[in-house]
Amino acid sequence: MTTLRQFFLITELRQKLFYTFALLTACRVGVFIPVPGINGELAVAYFKQLLGSGQNLFQLADIFSGGAFAQMTVIALGVVPYISASIIVQLFLVFMPALQREMRESSDQGKRRIGRLTRLFTVALAVIQSLLFAKFALRMNLTIPGIVLPTLLSSKLFGVPWIFYITTVVVMTTGTLLLMWIGEQISDKGIGNGISLIIALGILSSFPSVLGSIVNKLNLGSQDSSDLGLISILILALVFVFVLITTILIIEGVRKIPVQYARRVIGRREVPGGGSYLPLKVNYAGVIPVIFASSLLMFPATIGQFIASESSWMKRIAALLAPGSLVYSICYVLLIIFFTYFWTATQFHPEQIASEMKKNNAFIPGIRQGKPTQHYLEYTMNRVTLLGALFLAAIAILPSLLGCLLRVDSNVSYFLGGTAMLIVVGVVLDTMKQVDAFLLMRRYDSVLKTDRTKGRH
């Protein structure tokens, strides 16, 4: 209640939240603007046929894009190219020590260089994906004539409808770049991580369809396995609560390392030592590993689906990487564990912490300062990270288990248990932390201003 009251009282916070809300609303507008020359209603009908035949990959892609994928709108690619580009750049950083040094010495300049690289890769990946998307739309048009307007198919160059290809590539790439820009603006001038908020908004927008699926299949007295009976509803509710509580515990959980301070001289006074603790987060990476792993698996699988009819080996790869398959689940778990460790290694710097502790005469009881402290922090963080990574992976594969156990629609299992819930809860918690941090800074500023005023008098 206090935070809510301060929201209405603090003008700057109110402006940030309204700015964020306005940009996120603009994102949703793009869901209803189809790519020129494509009939969105017929496209949705085609995708429903695919979902009926078990093509769960498109269901996952549609959830991530907030319904834009199935309607073939201008933002159908979503932020997946941007996330894939971020993964590529972060992996490149491991082999670019010069850029890593620049990041440490001048973080602003290093971030600008990384931002430019990420944008370049985003454009390249968006162009590739939109080309494949256009090719897939032409294949859809053979099944349901009218998905692509005939006027765009009349002009051909070497047998290729070049006007349709150029239009689709330009429009869809622009849509992805617009989402990327909106995400960056929210991160800079609004509240929360912009890209994560866009993904979370897309997931939340699927809630009405999830609720509709549950209501349509709800039959408490039925013995039919295709209906949702009382036991199935109870299991879904328990899984939802379990995922919610477990996600909060994983993201908020910390391992407290005891820290002691020796006697220090501040000015002319000798300050006695005291005790404190160093919090090491159980899941330092948050929901980043889940977003990265989902996007990375979605990229090759989507390409495989788009060109599967022309290549038998690509068709096999697409089938193997379909959400819910054994290979997909194994790759998903391994990627989540890998990205959890990878992101933690890039963001957590034990050598800096050990150096700062030594400067401030702080030490961990039983551990010498300097290198021994650094090694101890690395060892402890590795053990804690393993626990967090395994929990993330276990929750992320819940949709597959739910789908097999309860035979519910894939959109229901994805939303109520697993990846979608992890992302939404993680993004909400992160945004709340940023609001609290902003309020804390405001409180400190007001205290400092009061002290300065008293000093003048």
UniProtKB/Swiss-Prot annotation:
Spell out the PROSITE patterns in the cross-references: SECY_1 (PS00755), SECY_2 (PS00756)
Q: What kind of membrane protein is this, topologically?
A: Multi-pass membrane protein
Highest taxon of source = Bacteria
A GO BP term, please? protein targeting
What does the function comment of this entry state? The central subunit of the protein translocation channel SecYEG. Consists of two halves formed by TMs 1-5 and 6-10. These two domains form a lateral gate at the front which open onto the bilayer between TMs 2 and 7, and are clamped together by SecE at the back. The channel is closed by both a pore ring composed of hydrophobic SecY resides and a short helix (helix 2A) on the extracellular side of the membrane which forms a plug. The plug probably moves laterally to allow the channel to open. The ring and the pore may move independently.
Quaternary structure and partners: Component of the Sec protein translocase complex. Heterotrimer consisting of SecY, SecE and SecG subunits. The heterotrimers can form oligomers, although 1 heterotrimer is thought to be able to translocate proteins. Interacts with the ribosome. Interacts with SecDF, and other proteins may be involved. Interacts with SecA.
Q: Which PANTHER family match?
A: SECY/SEC61-ALPHA FAMILY MEMBER
Name-wise, this protein is Protein translocase subunit SecY
Read off the lineage from the record.
Answer: Bacteria, Pseudomonadati, Chlamydiota, Chlamydiia, Chlamydiales
